[in-house]
């Protein structure tokens, strides 16, 4: 009813409320319509699928299935056990942030024996989240109205006696202020924003005017997470290096350098595919980094000592960068070197010492 030929428009189709014929496994479809200068149309449809899961399964299996490393899964477990604090998941659009948030809330609901009040504020709700009261943003026509209604919904949630609150996106300074207010008044908070790394979350918060005393308190700023999605190789038909080169020719010198010493374990896509995959791939997997900051880490970051803070995180807080996580998956053969380098940078900068540590983490979990 509101379709306009030459306007930029977004829409959402929900299977339970639509008269259209939508496949059973599709929960909703997010649409973006853009007019082109030549009179054409540029249309994007993002399908959100129903997630089949047994929440009685062990937490480790749930998050491992998404692609998180055991070190990161343990970190998430510790974060969920905290009674208060802000936990922020960052990444670009389409990096799986909503799926991770959904899993966190459902795991919290299960771990708290379903005796917990969890409220989310989403614009719009992308998935049904078991055990969560999901507040949508409604009755808006302009972006200004949308922002005001979103903030109003967060305030309403805070007045509804929540234990855990999840604003889907910390989209502006006012929302971020409400997020920290929620934590300071005794709530565990999960949210997301757009940042290129876990450390860059700190910069985004500072740019939005968050006070220094909040940014240097690890009891308040408890979790900094960044993630990407990388195409996952089909385990049934992926190719060894020699098989791939026999079909496609020699890989480049840069890629050969990146896999040096692990030629026997790396894998490549079979672009012809098999009955179990789509052109050599079976979905996507997460590469991530999770920081549980302490006073020293936040103090170093606040002083602008980024290299020292990163070194401290990696060596003293048992950290792992997103690039290192991608390297592990590449060495294990679950993602291809080509796909890894598209999603993360500086794989060639991982030191021999760090590689030895990462190999040790693989051996501990085999």
PLM regions: where:
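Switch/coupling sub-region of P-loop NTPases
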Residues: 77-80, 87, 104-231
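NTP-binding/hydrolysis catalytic cores, primarily Walker-type P-loop NTPases
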Residues: 64-78, 251-366
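N-terminal "pre-motor" subdomain/linker immediately upstream of P-loop NTPase catalytic cores
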Residues: 1-94, 99-100, 326-366
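Conserved, well-folded catalytic cores of nucleic-acid-processing
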Residues: 1-2, 32-36, 50, 66-69, ...
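Conserved nucleotide-binding/hydrolysis micro-motifs of P-loop NTPases
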Residues: 19, 34-38, 50-52, 86, ...
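Helical mechanochemical/support elements of P-loop NTPase systems and associated helical scaffolds
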Residues: 5, 9, 25-27, 37-41, ...
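Hydrophobic alpha-helical scaffolding
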Residues: 66, 90-94, 169, 191, ...
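Cys/His-rich Zn2+-binding cysteine-cluster or related metal-binding knuckle/ribbon modules and their
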Residues: 196-293
């Amino acid at each position: 009813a509101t379709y306009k030929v030459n306007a930029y428009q977004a829409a959402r189709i929900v299977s339970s409320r639509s008269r259209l014929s939508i496949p059973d496994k599709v929960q909703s479809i997010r649409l973006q319509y853009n007019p082109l200068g030549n009179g054409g149309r540029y249309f994007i449809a993002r399908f959100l699928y129903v997630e089949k899961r047994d929440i009685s399964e062990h937490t480790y299996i749930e998050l491992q299935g998404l692609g998180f490393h055991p070190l990161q899964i343990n970190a998430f477990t510790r974060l969920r056990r905290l009674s208060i604090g802000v936990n922020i998941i960052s990444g670009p659009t389409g990096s799986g942030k909503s799926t991770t948030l959904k899993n966190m809330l459902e795991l919290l609901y299960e771990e708290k024996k379903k005796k917990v009040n969890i409220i989310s504020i989403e614009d719009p709700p992308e998935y049904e989240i078991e055990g969560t009261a999901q507040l949508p943003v409604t009755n808006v026509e302009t972006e200004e109205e949308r922002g005001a209604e979103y903030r109003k919904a967060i305030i309403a949630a805070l007045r509804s006696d929540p234990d855990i609150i999840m604003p889907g996106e910390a989209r502006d300074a006012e929302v971020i202020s409400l997020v920290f207010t929620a934590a300071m008044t005794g709530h565990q908070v999960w949210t997301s924003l757009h940042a290129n790394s876990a450390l860059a979350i700190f910069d985004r918060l500072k740019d939005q005017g968050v006070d220094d005393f909040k940014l240097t308190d690890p009891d308040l700023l408890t979790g900094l997470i960044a993630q990407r999605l990388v195409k996952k190789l089909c385990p049934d038909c992926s190719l060894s290096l020699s098989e791939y080169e026999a079909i496609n020719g020699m890989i480049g010198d840069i890629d050969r350098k990146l896999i040096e010493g692990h030629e026997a374990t790396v894998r490549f896509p079979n672009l012809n595919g098999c009955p179990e995959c789509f052109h050599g791939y079976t979905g996507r997997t997460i590469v991530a980094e999770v920081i549980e900051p302490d006073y020293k880490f936040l103090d170093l970051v606040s002083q602008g000592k980024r290299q020292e803070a990163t070194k401290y995180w990696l060596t003293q807080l048992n950290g792992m960068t997103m690039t290192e996580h991608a390297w592990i998956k590449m060495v294990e053969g679950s993602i291809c070197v080509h796909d890894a380098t598209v999603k993360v940078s500086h794989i060639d900068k991982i030191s021999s010492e760090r590689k030895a540590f990462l190999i040790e983490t693989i051996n501990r979990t085999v």
